[in-house]
């Protein structure tokens, strides 16, 4: 399971948030784990953002000052071809891919940067536009 709209920015490039071997783990535990990982870089209790999780399907969650709820799928596909690295030394920030209906308010920790990128790619009748 991976986040498709939130990434770490590092000295070597962009890094995915991925949790492996998730077959026997419930989704709420995994979402809490992603939020726990993010809490190292942002103030969860002061921030509002969306987590888009991809396993076999895409699921949307909203984290509002630490309170997590599932929200309706808006058919954004998050399919931009992005480059990722596996090896890095230093995390410099967190990147959020947002849409017109997914506003965010992020309070960073320890001088980490917050980067936001906007997408509008939606799934329409079998096509990614």
Curated annotation (Swiss-Prot):
Any one cellular-component term (Gene Ontology): virion component
Keyword hit for Cell membrane: no
Predominant localisation class: virion
Induction or repression: Expressed in the intermediate phase of the viral replicative cycle.
InterPro entries in the cross-refs: Virion_core (IPR009201)
UniProt keyword annotation of Signal present: no
Superkingdom: Viruses
Pfam families: Chordopox_E11
Cellular compartments annotated: Virion
Alphabetized UniProt keyword annotations: Virion
Family named by the database record: Belongs to the orthopoxvirus OPG073 family.
Protein name: Core protein OPG073
Organism: Variola virus (isolate Human/India/Ind3/1967) (VARV)
